[in-house]
């Protein structure tokens, strides 16, 4: 999930809201992994990447102007999709490759 912060909202609040709106899941806990600047020198935009823990299925709440497909993809398939160049979104690639590195580091 991704989205803009509402006025007065911090990164965690935005991440929780966007997770539920776009996937239908609620997280018991969100852990900030890191912040990235997608285009330094061009804009001061920051993107916060989070790990969700304790997921509970709820209901998806897409905004009317959003064209989003939300589906569960098995882990093995996700990494095949990366290898095949099917996932092109930079922030998604960073988050997924971080996840893979963590799994390798922890012997999984």
Per-region residue spans from a language model:
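Nudix hydrolase/Nudix homology domain
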Residues: 1, 7, 32, 40, ...
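Conserved Nudix-box catalytic region and its N-terminal flanking loop in Nudix hydrolases
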Residues: 1-17, 34, 60
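Helix N-cap/coil-helix junction residues
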Residues: 24-25, 87
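A short coil-to-beta-strand element that immediately follows conserved catalytic motifs
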Residues: 26-33
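Active-site-adjacent beta-strand/loop module that shapes the phosphate/pyrophosphate-binding cleft
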Residues: 36-58, 71
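Short small-residue beta-strand/loop micro-motif enriched in glycine and branched aliphatics
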Residues: 58-61, 80
């Amino acid at each position: 999930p991704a989205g803009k912060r509402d006025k007065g909202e911090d990164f965690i609040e935005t991440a929780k809201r966007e997770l539920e709106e776009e996937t239908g899941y609620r997280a018991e806990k969100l852990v900030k992994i890191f912040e990235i600047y997608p285009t330094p020198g061009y804009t001061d935009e920051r993107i916060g990447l989070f790990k969700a823990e304790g997921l509970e299925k709820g209901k998806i709440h897409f905004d009317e102007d959003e064209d989003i497909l939300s589906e569960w993809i098995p882990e093995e398939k996700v990494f095949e999709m990366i290898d095949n160049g099917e996932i092109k979104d930079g922030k998604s690639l960073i988050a997924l490759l971080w996840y893979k590195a963590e799994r390798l580091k922890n012997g999984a």
